[in-house]
């Protein structure tokens, strides 16, 4: 793949269109049901050329145009991006994708971490069941999830672990949890290291686990891509939408304000052009 675009908002689809017009293979990756605030906007009046269109309709028009041009789409949360020579490896849930350039278009939403979560990441806390599940074979684990995607992950972990407890970070349907996975009606508050295990404190009590797996609809920028420079929670870019790492670009609300659709679309276009120039220089 030439360009992997992370995020399916206006910036992402605009980037995909321009990339395809440049003849580059392109995939747009975002969790199922994503679309940010725009997907819920009842009426948009300030996008040039379209009067009184809903956010959902506008997004679908962007999507259909990009797909008609040959862009691909994949429903998955990108949990980590790793440079690999002149390529990038993207860990997208249970798959690994490779691309020559990456354009980050995830919008402005940022997950709030639990106290102690970042400190224990890689040492008892994981965001990837497929990657780390085998380390907890025959052990006691917990799954903390903000959506139904965690149900599938819990089912996989149940095939390995001795026991799996499931905590909903946000309300969602847990009726399809497999046998052997226990839904716990408590709200996680913090994580810490206790007695050589991960201590999960809730609004009721503390539980000890060998491992804790956390699944959200977004990943903190500092954990998504090591070395990515940010400013006030936004990705720092130049006028060509180049980020601090070679081969990485960003567009839309993820680069900061103003948080406008037209601005996101324009930045997506610029990012695609810059990414195309970068790829051409790779030879």
Residue ranges of predicted features:
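FAD-site-proximal beta/loop scaffold in flavoenzymes
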Residues: 113, 119-135, 215-263, 270-273, ...
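Glycine-rich FAD pyrophosphate-binding loop
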Residues: 21-39, 167-173
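Rossmann-like NAD(P)H-binding beta-loop-alpha module
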Residues: 21, 29, 139-160
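N-terminal Rossmann-like FAD-binding beta1-loop-alpha1 element of flavoenzymes
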Residues: 2-27
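FAD-binding core/adjacent interface of flavoenzyme oxidoreductases
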Residues: 1-6, 21, 73-138, 199-204, ...
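A Rossmann-like FAD-binding core segment of flavoenzymes
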Residues: 66-85, 89-91, 97-99, 159-239, ...
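Residue-level detector of alpha-helix initiation sites
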Residues: 9-10, 33, 148-149, 255-256
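Conserved N-terminal glycine-rich FAD pyrophosphate-binding loop of Rossmann-like flavoproteins
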Residues: 32-55
């Amino acid at each position: 793949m030439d360009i992997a675009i992370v995020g399916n908002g206006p910036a992402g689809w605009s980037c995909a269109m321009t990339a395809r017009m440049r003849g580059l293979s392109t995939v747009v990756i975002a969790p199922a049901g994503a679309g940010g605030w725009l997907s819920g906007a009842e009426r948009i009046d300030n996008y040039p050329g379209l009067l009184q269109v809903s956010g959902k309709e506008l997004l679908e028009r962007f999507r259909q145009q990009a797909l008609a041009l040959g862009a691909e789409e994949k429903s998955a949360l990108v949990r980590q991006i790793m440079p690999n020579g002149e390529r990038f490896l993207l860990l997208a849930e249970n798959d690994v994708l490779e691309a020559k350039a990456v354009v980050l278009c995830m919008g402005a939403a940022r997950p709030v971490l639990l106290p102690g979560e970042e400190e224990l990441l890689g040492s008892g806390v994981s965001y990837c069941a497929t990657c780390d599940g085998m380390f907890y074979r025959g052990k006691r684990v917990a799954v903390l999830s903000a959506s139904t995607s965690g149900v599938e992950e819990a089912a996989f972990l149940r095939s390995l672990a001795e026991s799996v407890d499931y905590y909903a970070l946000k309300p969602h349907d847990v009726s399809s949890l497999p046998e052997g996975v226990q839904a716990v009606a408590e709200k996680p508050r913090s994580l810490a290291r206790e007695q050589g295990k991960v201590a999960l404190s809730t609004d009721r009590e503390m539980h000890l686990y060998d491992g804790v797996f956390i699944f959200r609809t977004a990943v903190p920028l500092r954990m998504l891509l090591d070395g990515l420079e940010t400013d006030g929670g936004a990705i720092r870019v130049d006028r060509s939408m180049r980020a601090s790492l070679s081969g990485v670009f960003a567009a839309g609300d993820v680069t900061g304000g103003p948080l406008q659709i037209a601005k996101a679309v324009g930045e997506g276009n610029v990012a695609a052009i810059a990414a195309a120039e970068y790829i051409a220089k790779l030879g």
